[in-house]
Amino acid sequence: TSRYNKVWEFPYEVRGRRVTMVFTSVTGHLSNFEFADDRHRRWNGVDPRELLVNAAVAKRVPEDKRQVADNVKREARGCDSVILWLDCDREGENIAFEVLAACREANRGIAAFRARFSALSR
């Protein structure tokens, strides 16, 4: 478990159904895009044109986010659905899809719902 992303469980009602709500958080993105080949990661050791034309890119969970991603996967295994409560902007949407991918890696059949909210300000 990530010490920064606690897990809470409590009884709740969703769409008229009593459920056990499992609530946790993430700290930013769960994954990064990196060059797949180690030799492409050294900026001064490769021709930039090769990076644009020939370099494969892979999406990976960085070491500092592994505990957070593992926490999401562990909790998703026992859930029927996930409600994604992330910011309703581009980054929030991107992070929501990363969280959903982690959930579905652990539980292919998990249903997904998206909470939509906005802030009122003066």
Go through the PLM ranges and name each one.
Residues 1-122:
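Intrinsically disordered, low-complexity regulatory segments
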